[in-house]
Each structure stands twice: as C-alpha cells, then as structure tokens.
Amino acid sequence: SKDFLILTYTPNEGMVTDNSINNLLSLKYKIQSLSWVHSVITLLDVPLLDNSDAPLQERLESFKTLKDEDVDKNRGFKEILNSPVFRNFVISEDGKTSGIIITIKEIKKLNNIQNKSKEEIERYKDKIKKQNHENILEIRQVIKSYGDVGKIYLGGIPMIADDMMTFIKSDIVVFGLGVLLFIIATLWFVFRKLI
C-alpha cells in the first residue's frame, strides 16, 4: 500500500467562493507537480450526482465536480456536506475545513532482501529516510507559499516519523551538550583548588 500525507485547508473566505476554489485548485496542481507525488484528492474531485436534474444514468456517465464551470457550487457543496461518504473525509462537518489527501509514489523496493547484507539494507533504509525528509521539507515549502490564502496543516505517518527523527536528533545534541557542560562544571568544582 502507498503512504499518504494529509493536508487540512481552511480558507480565509467561504469554502466555495471562486477565490477559495481557485486557491485549492492551484495548491492541488502545485502538489501534484512534485516528483514524488502519485495523486492528490481534494474536495474538488468529489463526484456530484445530485447537482443537476438530468436522469441518474446520464449523471453517472458524465458526473460533474465543484471545479466544473457549469456547476452550482453551493448546491454541490451542500451535497458533499450532507453525504455520508464524503462528510468527515474531504470536508469537516461544519464545512469550513477541507481535507487534501496526497498519495506518495512507491519507492523502489529492495529486491532479494534475504540475499542482501545488513550494510546494504541499512543504506537502503537511510536512503528512504533521507528521501522522506526531503519530501516533507518540499511539501512544507509549498504550504508556506500558500499561507496567505488560509490555514493549511500537514499530517500523516511519513510526516510524523520524519518529525520524530528530527526531534530525537535535536534532543540528543541538546542532551549531549548538557552532559558535557555538567561534566566540565563538576570537574572544575572538584579540581578548582588544584589549579
């Protein structure tokens, strides 16, 4: 199964204003252009089946989405908001926050893993961790560039794993420096009379 990241997008304006839809569409295309992204699903990709008065068969064959020009945005938004399938999946219950699901391309697996040395396996794991870290930094840059259009937050297992590793490395450095300073202070206190 593919890993994924989740963004939450709360626009400064209403969710279905032209501005908010254009910003969400722009954000989607920007994320989709990243080399490591497989697909991006947003509120704008949800099929609308109750948005027209056409026969059901016709609506199923050529369904519309909120990004289509000839769609009643408010009616479509209400349909998604009242849908038991999509409510709390791509839209919050109050309709103010939208979810963006980013599926990550699978990284080439290590073939014949049982025939590989521990060193080769560790190099492979390090390569994956480094790539994941670079991906997280890249998506955070994209989020930062859209900071003026609303509140955007990042989540998902790859992001949590990367943040944990970053925090642990930082904590080790801080703890190491603290221990070093403690040892120096202790040695100075014990041997200060000799100096």
Language-model region placement:
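Short helix C-cap/helix-to-loop transition motifs enriched in small/turn-promoting residues
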Residues: 30-40, 49, 66-70, 110, ...
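Flexible hinge/switch segments at interdomain interfaces of large molecular machines
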Residues: 2, 53-56, 91-96
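Charged, often glycine-rich, active-site loop that binds/positions anionic groups
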Residues: 21, 25, 50-67, 165-173
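A short acidic, often aromatic-flanked loop/helix-cap motif at beta-alpha or helix-coil junctions
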Residues: 46-51, 160-162
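Generic detector of short, locally flexible boundary/turn motifs and exposed helical patches
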Residues: 4-6, 53-56, 61-69, 117-120, ...
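Short, glycine/acidic-enriched capping/hinge loops at junctions between secondary-structure elements
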Residues: 17-20, 53, 112-113
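Extracytoplasmic
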Residues: 67-194
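Extracytoplasmic/periplasmic
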Residues: 1-48
